Regions:
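12-transmembrane solute porter fold
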Residues: 14-35, 48, 203, 217, ...
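Intrinsic disorder in cytosolic terminal tails and internal cytosolic loops
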Residues: 1-11, 194, 456-495
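C-terminal membrane-cytosol helix-exit motif in multi-pass small-molecule transporters
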Residues: 136, 174-193, 209-221, 237-252, ...
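Helix-loop-helix hairpins in multi-pass membrane proteins, especially solute transporters
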Residues: 71-203, 221, 389, 393, ...
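Helix-breaking motifs and short loop linkers at transmembrane-helix boundaries and internal kinks
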Residues: 43-45, 77, 98-104, 162-165, ...
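Central cavity-lining transmembrane alpha-helices of secondary-active solute carriers
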Residues: 56-70, 120-124, 308-320
Length: 495
């Protein structure tokens, strides 16, 4: 199997299904809970801050540990760590389903994020190191599309499950995990980086986690408590920890994030774009389902169904969008996709003036779907093509950490920017005012993604990454518990 597994073979299809299904669970849980937030708030008597933490506790640990997941896979075996992640994620999902209070649910969501951090980078790294080179771009593009579909499908599935009980939103992961484990065992060979060496960068990981956690706390608490001593202290702590993290990664013998990885212009640019796009997308998915339910009075299922056009478009066409990048280069699909998505969000700003799905909601979600279908597969494939193959897990972990941290900070910051706090989200008029401000910001973030894409060096996906930084990267291979807050530090898809 020196040339890799062919996508057209039964084993290749099983491998793609196993990686898409497992990582899809993690992406699904990034969005499925959004549609359940109003119901969870009522049944567990949760404030807006508690609902934000229900989303962000998961994203926080996912972003904080996702680089560790990539490094562990590169060292101990990508299939092994992927399987551990699936099992851990499933066990935490059961705890979420049984949670009697908002506090217990938040804690279980944090545990769930740990499992997601182990399985998410492993899925992409398994494809990158196992698939035949000729099939790799298409396999990764299809994986990205299917994973994106799972994230967008979250509100629909969540709405349907809420017809029975919100706890099924988490319990549904159990049968999915059983299928995933079976598929990965029968289809994926074990792989690892035999040259990996060095100690885990525990200090770097701790500094990154503190930076992201402290900034998230300050952003969520500020609308209600203002410039309290605790909030100001957390803000200062986050800045100091972020500075300490960057210094540590520059000077450590074995950094968790080799900063020389960012010396590749494409890798740096695509991660900047990832941050902007996933921040915008996470904000859209957080606000749209609440707006549809609270302001328009739609049921959770109706709010979930509203996103179906986006799901259908990604399911039908994501597998082919990577072919566009091979033919025209990476910039056109990335720029066009970001601008289409931004235009779709602009149309969704008007939701609330009327409740006609065909005229008020459908145009926006359709245009957003076209943008994501064009953008996401090319973005993912570009990340992996711009890094040395033996650092596939680290590159995947960095990009996923950027995406998750972006979503984390967006969900924490947007309510504050829009002036929404406490129980104000239950007031349709106050919510609509905040919704429009937040969606305008999200559209702007997607437009920033297009600008970032324009700075990328034109290249086809078949071109190898520059080799200059590769040797240096190998010398400083990342192998530490992941940070969280590095990229400016934030997906999700869209997460």
């Amino acid at each position: 199997m020196t040339d890799g597994v062919r996508l057209a073979t039964p084993r290749g299809r099983a491998l793609l299904a196993a990686t898409a299904l497992g990582s899809g669970m993690a992406f699904l849980d990034s969005t499925v809970v959004n549609v359940a937030l109003p119901t969870i708030g009522r049944e567990l008597d949760a404030s807006l801050a508690a609902l934000q933490w229900t989303v962000n506790a998961y994203t926080l640990t996912l972003a904080a540990l996702i680089l560790l997941g990539g490094s562990l896979g590169d060292r101990l075996g990508r299939r092994r760590i992927y399987l551990v992640g699936v099992v851990w994620f499933t066990a935490a999902s059961v705890l979420c389903a049984l949670a009697p209070t908002a506090e217990v649910l938040i804690a279980a969501r944090a545990l769930q994020g740990i499992g997601g951090a182990l399985l998410t980078p492993g899925a992409l790294a398994i494809l990158q190191t196992t698939m035949h080179p000729d099939d790799r771009p298409r396999a990764i593009g299809t994986w990205a599309g299917l994973t994106g579909v799972s994230g967008v499908l979250g509100p629909l599935l969540g709405g349907w499950l809420l017809e029975y009980d919100w706890r099924w939103v988490f319990a549904i992961n159990v049968p999915l995990a059983v299928v995933t484990v079976w598929l990965i065992v029968v289809s994926a060979p074990e792989s690892r980086d035999e040259q990996a060496s060095g100690k885990f960068d525990v200090s770097g990981a701790a500094l990154g986690a503190v930076a992201l956690g402290a900034s998230t706390y300050a952003l969520i608490s500020w609308p209600e408590d203002g410039a309290s001593a605790l909030n100001v202290g957390m803000a200062v702590l986050s800045v100091a920890a972020a500075a300490g993290f960057l210094y540590r990664e520059r000077t450590a013998a074995h950094p968790m994030v080799p900063l020389s990885l960012f010396s590749d212009r494409t890798f740096s640019g695509i991660n900047l774009m990832t941050f902007a796009v996933y921040a915008g997308l996470s904000g859209v998915m957080f606000f749209i389902v609440i707006q549809l339910q609270v302001t328009l009075g739609w049921s959770p299922l109706e709010a979930g169904i509203a996103t179906i056009p986006t799901t259908i478009l990604m399911l039908l066409f994501s597998g082919k969008s990577a072919d566009l990048a091979k033919r025209f280069g990476i910039r056109p699909p990335l720029v066009v996709g970001s601008l289409c998505g931004a235009a779709g969000v602009v149309l969704l700003v008007a939701v609330g003036d009327g409740d006609n799905y065909l005229t008020d909601v459908l145009p926006g979600v359709t245009l957003l779907g076209i943008g994501l279908t064009t953008l996401v597969p090319t973005l993912t494939a570009t990340v992996m093509a711009s890094a040395p193959q033996h650092l596939a897990g680290v590159a995947s972990g960095v990009n996923n950490g950027v995406a998750r941290a972006a979503g984390l900070l967006a969900v924490a910051a947007l309510p504050a920017i829009a002036g929404l706090s406490g129980a104000a989200y239950e007031d349709p008029e106050l919510l609509t005012d905040a919704y429009r401000i937040a969606m305008g910001v999200c559209a702007g973030l997607l437009a920033v993604g297009a600008v970032a894409a324009m700075t990328l060096r034109p290249r086809a996906l078949t071109e190898p990454p520059t080799t200059a930084p590769a040797a240096e990267l190998h010398e400083h291979e990342a192998a530490a518990p992941a940070p969280c807050s590095a990229p400016g530090l934030p997906p999700s898809h869209g997460s």
